Amino acid sequence: MVWLAELPDEILENLYPGEDVLYSVKKKLYTELKPKYLIVTDRRIIYLDQKILGRYDLIDIPYEKLEFVHFKKGKIGAKFIIRNEEGEEIVLTWMEKDEAEKAIEAIRDAINAIAVEPVSIQKRKGILGFELELSKPKEFITRTYPQAVAKAAPKEDPIERIRKLKELYESGVISREEFEEKKRKLLDQI
């Protein structure tokens, strides 16, 4: 879990209610004026490219729309390629390798937490690093996210319920004993 205070405002403004940030990687090279972020939540991957004068580009890919994530860890840094089902790619290069490796693990765990079938993993180990590719199954089915609980309908006034109960008694739907018993219970609520 990431401390929300560590995240830029642009991310906080774009989180869904109840969405948890699982991991965050900040990438800033000396040649770049503003950092780039890779945010892993329980629902999606978010890429934020901050620019000068308060501008920014934000791209999110929900796990349901994710095609694959390619990760390459080398001797000096790491590289991410994230592709959605439409073929659009997010490419992040020169990332801090250990932080990036934790991010790919967070992505894998987040997808597996909502997927019925686990993601496919291809791993190639080299002399100076490794490559990892996560692919979702063709028939990707997810568990639903918990929705906000609907508020219960307001309770009817006990006096009004006694009136309705009396109408049922007078029309012969319930007996005198049933009427008296239910009336007593309703009077106890007052």
UniProtKB/Swiss-Prot annotation:
InterPro entries: SHOCT, YokE-like_PH
Superkingdom of source: Archaea
Name listed for the protein in its UniProt record: Uncharacterized protein AF_0689
Upper lineage: Archaea, Methanobacteriati, Methanobacteriota, Archaeoglobi, Archaeoglobales
